[in-house]
Design a protein with these regions (language model features):
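Short SAM/SAH-binding signature in class I
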Residues: 108-110
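Short beta-strand segments
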Residues: 112-114
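Sec/Tat signal peptide C-region and signal peptidase I cleavage site
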Residues: 15-19
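Single-residue recognition of alpha-helix boundary sites
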Residues: 13-14, 39
Length: 158
């Protein structure tokens, strides 16, 4: 799976103009159900976060961005620990701020966000394609080549 991810990153970077950075964007993993406005990850969510970490171990991620919510921080945590990166927290409502940070970045990044904010982030990064992430869908794995000609690669992960 790691080799496939590396091939996908190379494919996106090789097509068209050279990208300044590759941004992996995922929705937070499965959360617990309940009445909390800020629920933690469920057991399935923690397992998915570990899978994400294994997938990104050799991807040369140099920055990680999460929102202020537990579920995004917990999804990013295994990757952050494995890569020894302190995640940057950006408020979920500050899509333009996050997009600016990603455009300024010279390296690969992981963004863990929310199903209702990812479509706006993709659009703000220059990708104008319809994207809908249903409430019960946690397996979208998006790679955006950020540069003069932004490109999007959609994938699903276990």
């Amino acid at each position: 799976m790691k080799r496939l991810l590396l091939c996908l990153l190379l494919l996106v970077s090789a097509s068209g103009a050279r990208a300044e950075s590759m941004v992996v964007i995922v929705r937070h993993a499965e959360k617990t159900s309940g009445e909390s406005d800020d629920p933690p990850l469920s057991d399935a969510g923690r397992a998915r976060a570990e899978t994400l970490s294994r997938m990104l171990r050799d991807s040369e991620i140099s920055a990680i961005f999460t929102t202020e919510f537990k579920r995004t921080k917990e999804t990013a945590a295994p990757t952050a620990i494995a890569l020894k990166i302190t995640p940057t927290v950006v408020r979920a409502t500050e899509i333009a701020t996050l997009a600016d940070k990603l455009r300024e970045l010279h390296g690969n990044a992981l963004v863990v966000a929310h199903g209702n904010t990812i479509p706006d982030l993709i659009k703000t990064l220059g990708i104008d394609v319809p994207l809908n992430i249903p409430e019960n869908d946690y397996d979208h794995f998006l790679i955006v080549a950020v540069g003069s000609q932004p490109r999007l690669l959609r994938w699903r992960y276990p």
